[in-house]
């Protein structure tokens, strides 16, 4: 008699270990990413905090410096005469630098009090529209970057009354895109009353690097004294 024998099926391989490894790697990745983000945020916070501490320290030093000057002026004995003299010398140097910067800025902006000359495309006008344009009859605007020779001649009537003997000033000015206007060249000439209208000329010229969109123009102290005859007053530029 033959009996059947059922052999038990083999057990399936355990799959729990790979699943646990995947979960572990997933959690580890999240932890590392979180740590990196946290470290970056902490670095930004620390940088800003150090900047704030530096500003506070500078303000504290300025406050101590001003208090020391006050103590020197009141004649407190806690400070020696040598220390007070050195501190006062530093303070006077700071004030002098501030005043010099203010005077320089005033000189740079003084041309705003003058008047821009008007120009017309006549006479020996040879400007190329592909290179430069005359805008509003006042300024020449370049379209290409490069070195330019800029020139100007202003002829004016030098006869003046005795009550107004201020020199006639002509300024060649530059206005760059996104920047303030500044003076490139300036010249002055005194008036003369020996003739009914003695003609005098001022010549300005130089080589400058201009960016696309930069404009140049001429300012004078009194446009009513300018002689506009052909060849007397001119303004232009040449690309080198």
Swiss-Prot record:
Disulfide bonds: 157-197
GO terms assigned for molecular function: CD40 receptor binding; cytokine activity; protein serine/threonine kinase activator activity; tumor necrosis factor receptor binding
Domain THD: 94-240
Site, Cleavage: residue positions: 112-113
PTM description: The soluble form derives from the membrane form by proteolytic processing.
Key words, A-Z: Cell membrane, Cytokine, Disulfide bond, Glycoprotein, Membrane, Secreted, Signal-anchor, Transmembrane, Transmembrane helix
Any one of the GO CC terms: plasma membrane
Membrane topology listed for this record: Single-pass type II membrane protein
InterPro entries assigned: CD40L, TNF_CS, TNF_dom, Tumour_necrosis_fac-like_dom
Subcellular localization: Cell membrane; Cell surface
Ranges facing Extracellular side: 44-240
A Gene Ontology BP annotation from the UniProt entry: positive regulation of interleukin-4 production
CDD domains reported in the protein's UniProt record: TNF
Keyword Transmembrane helix: yes
Presence of keyword Glycoprotein: yes
Protein name listed in UniProt: CD40 ligand
Organism of provenance: Macaca nemestrina (Pig-tailed macaque)
The encoding gene: CD40LG
């Amino acid at each position: 008699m033959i009996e059947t024998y059922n052999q038990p099926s083999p057990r399936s391989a355990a799959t729990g270990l790979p699943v646990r490894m995947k979960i572990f790697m997933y959690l580890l990745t999240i932890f590392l990413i979180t740590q990196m983000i946290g470290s970056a945020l902490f670095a930004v916070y620390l940088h800003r905090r150090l900047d704030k501490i530096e500003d506070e320290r500078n303000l504290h030093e300025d406050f101590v410096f001003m208090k020391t000057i006050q103590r020197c002026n009141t004649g407190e004995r806690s400070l020696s005469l040598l220390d007070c003299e050195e501190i006062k010398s530093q303070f006077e140097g700071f004030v002098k630098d501030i005043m010099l910067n203010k005077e320089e800025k005033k000189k740079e902006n003084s041309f705003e009090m003058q008047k821009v000359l008007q120009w017309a495309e006549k006479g020996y006008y040879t400007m190329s529209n592909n290179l430069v344009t005359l805008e509003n009859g006042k300024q020449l605007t370049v379209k290409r970057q490069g070195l330019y020779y800029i020139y100007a001649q202003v002829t004016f009537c030098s006869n003046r009354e005795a009550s107004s003997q201020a020199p006639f000033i002509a300024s060649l000015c530059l206005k760059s895109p996104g920047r303030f206007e500044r003076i490139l060249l300036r010249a002055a000439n005194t008036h003369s009353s020996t003739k009914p209208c003695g003609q005098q000329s001022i010549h300005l010229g130089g080589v400058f690097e201009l960016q696309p969109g930069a404009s140049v123009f001429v300012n004078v102290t009194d446009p009513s004294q300018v002689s506009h005859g052909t060849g007397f007053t001119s303004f232009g530029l040449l690309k080198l």
